[in-house]
Amino acid sequence: MVKAVVLVKSPKKLIAARLKQVSLVNESFSVSGQFDAVAIIEVNELTQIKDVTIEIQKIAGVERTETMIQVQ
């Protein structure tokens, strides 16, 4: 399993709830600071992280994302 954290910038207030609807997003919540929400994803293959991130970027109102992949 590969875990990653995706930080999401979006003015939409319900972005964290919308992130939960994305396939392979295990958890999401709103945060304060430079980003507005965090999505925790778990995938079997490293290449799937890109697919999930692209899906998140397609959500209306998402301005930018930053992804951090767990290192072992």
Language-model features, listed with the residues they occupy:
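A compositional/biophysical signature of low hydrophobicity enriched in polar/charged and small residues
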Residues: M1-Q72
